[in-house]
Amino acid sequence: MAGVGFAAHRLELLASYQDVIGEDSPTDWALYTYEDGSDDLKLAASGGGGLLELSGHFEIQKVMYGFCSVKEPQAVLPKYVLVNWVGEDVPDARKCACASHVAKIAEFFQGVDVIVNASSVEDIDPGAIGQRLSNGLARVSSPVLHRLRLREDENAEPVGTTYQKTDATVEMKRLNREQFWEQAKKEEELRKEEERKKALDARLRFEQERMEQERLEQEERERRYREREEQIEEHRRKQQSMEAEEARQRLKEQSIFGEQQEEDDRQQLRKSESEVEEAAAIIAQRPDNPREFFKQQERVASGSGDAISPGSHRTGRLHCPFIKTADSGPPSSSSSSSSPPRTPFPYITCHRTPNLSSFFPCSQSDYRKVSAAGCSPCESSPASTPLGEQRTRAPAEETPATPKDSPSPSTQVAEPAATEQHWPFPGPEDKAAEPPGDEPDPDPRPAWTAGADVLGDLVTLEPSEPSPAPAASEPQPVETPGVAEPLIELWQSDGAAPAATSTWPLPDTPAGPPVPPEEGTLLGLDELPEPPATFCDAEQHEEVEEEEEEEEATAGEPHPTGLGYQEGYQEGPEVPPITNGEMGPKDGTAGRGEQASEGYFSQSQEEEAPPPEEPSAKAPQPVFYNKPPEIDITCWDTDPLPEEEESFGGGL
């Protein structure tokens, strides 16, 4: 808030003030008010009529100040009164603004004794104002007090002074001294100020240095942090590159190993194929199928009515020149297409055996002749059936001799085990067609024995000394008519009993009654071990399946056996199959199933043996025997046969 202003009308205000306080001036009052629209104080009016005249000049719309001199009769000097007039119509805001101006106006007009606040004429009462002025100043009415006052006035002495004449020298010294101290004080202040500035500068420099050091340290930390980050990133990149390189190396090694494995597999496959092709090529060189030899032997055995005594067996190793090992090797398209179907033989360990041509006792042609005459081409050995066991079992297994008027083989009922073989044995018609008086050439070579690789399909063992024939007093077992002598029985015989119905000439030996088949010479299906699984197994199974399909396809064709054999098969009653170790019925029927040679070398086992079928018009399936002779027979189809060892007589 702005204060009251005296500068605008200062001279006028002071002049009117001097007129009021002057003893010689007739003016005893002055009236002041504000200039329009401002707080500057100015003189409004003045006069000599006292309070009564002054009270007539106040206005109710303004704020005004009246300065008046009042003379009291009891007082020697006049008193001064300041009247603060605030009209009733003045706004409140203006009243508040001017309330603070009263003290400054009283200070400007020096000597004011009483300040009277008035808003109407009634508030300006001369008697009341005089009373206020006379409080404490009236003359004491007590005479004692009056005498005391007079006595004090009489005893009053003049007042002394301390004024002295001014000495310039002293004054100069004093002034100089004061100036010196003032100068010293100023210099001290300047020095302190400079020290403060220096301290401030030092503090500022320290702060700047500290901030610079902190900045450098921060930059160093950031640099180390960046370097650490770069090292970590570089290490991470190296680790990733190493991992990628290791992954590529592993993939490369895996690819190399995979390629090597594939190359090994391809080489193994090519080697297997080459072995298969070599075996197939060697097998394909055979001019005839050895299976025909077995069929011919079965024809001879079925045609012969004489039995061979079991006691005439010779000891020694078993000679098997007709073992068919071609089927034990892997089959091929050339062998299956160039040779007729063959009965599958069991697989025996595929390793090469030494040349066995020296073990053959005779050539194939001589062998065929001897077989027709009742001479066994290969004797039994402990590998197939022990001789002692055969001799001990023979008396127990003998059956009563049948009457001489027993039915012929053409009408004899054959048991299912024998009929299932269906060997192409010659019947009575075939026998009649042969010239009875023709003597076979002592050493002819049959057409089927020609070829350099026939010996590769046969295995023989050197025979030992033949055992003596049984005594004549011993009862000769009579073979049931109509049942063909098994091929193994022909091998075990010593040639003493010639075949009765054979068309070939027989040696001059007494024909004994036929003997029943020995139970000990048969092999049961339960006694056969499972052949080892080797390389030749898979191909052998495939060959077996192919041959079975061909046999089923040719089942409806006429069988090459004789009519008598067929009639005996068709008319014979059903007889349960005789397994190994069983005895045939003693009523003159077949005592034991005719045992084909190839059955000993067949592939079938207990789980693979076909169930016996009912007799029907179609040709029955051949019987497969599980247990081969206990001899070391190997797959040696690929073994070349020397030219000088082609004949069977090299071993004699």
UniProtKB/Swiss-Prot annotation:
Pfam families per UniProt: Cofilin_ADF
Annotated GO CC locations: anchoring junction; cortical actin cytoskeleton; dendrite; growth cone; lamellipodium; postsynaptic density; postsynaptic membrane; site of polarized growth
Keyword field: Acetylation, Actin-binding, Cell junction, Cell projection, Cytoplasm, Developmental protein, Differentiation, Neurogenesis
Record-listed N-acetylalanine modification sites: A2
Expressed in which tissues: Brain neurons.
Keyword Protein transport attached: no
InterPro entries per the UniProt record, alphabetical: ADF-H, ADF-H/Gelsolin-like_dom_sf
Entry keyword annotation includes Cell membrane: no
Signal peptide: none
Biased composition (Acidic residues): 540-554, 640-652
GO terms of biological process kind: neuron projection morphogenesis; positive regulation of axon extension; positive regulation of dendritic spine morphogenesis; postsynaptic actin cytoskeleton organization; regulation of actin filament polymerization
Compositionally biased intervals (Basic and acidic residues): 211-236, 288-298
Region (Disordered), start-end ranges: 211-350, 371-652
Coiled coil location: none
Source organism superkingdom: Eukaryota
Feature: compositional bias, Pro residues: 507-517
GO molecular function, one term: actin filament binding
Major subcellular site: cytoplasm
Bias (Low complexity) ranges: 328-340
Subcellular location: Cytoplasm; Cell projection, Dendrite; Cytoplasm, Cell cortex; Cell junction
Function (record text): Actin cytoskeleton-organizing protein that plays a role in the formation of cell projections. Plays a role in dendritic spine morphogenesis and organization, including the localization of the dopamine receptor DRD1 to the dendritic spines. Involved in synaptic plasticity.
Note in the entry: Drebrins are classified into two forms of the embryonic type (E1 and E2) and one form of the adult type (A). The time course of their appearance are different from each other. Their structures are closely related.
Protein name from the UniProt record: Drebrin
Taxonomic source organism: Gallus gallus
